[in-house]
């Protein structure tokens, strides 16, 4: 009986951890980079050039190449190819094209889910 209880606890714990790391949508604060700040054409942390018309983003922790769904008034899928943002209180930096696609002007709250 004790073994079944232990196994059940382990299973529930693993399920909760999986929900935290894969696909769980959560609120984050997004900002726009690569437009007026002069980053267009500069190198990203993974060596690519910042392409202001691409659907890419910068995130501090997600691995390069990770695809995330970002929603504001609309939703778009972006690929993480840079590190940042380095401004306190912000969680993800979007290129101008990605920000326009979701209706984000400058800085705002978005829903983020990893694909």
What label would you give each PLM region?
Residues 2-8, 16-115:
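Secreted/periplasmic proteins
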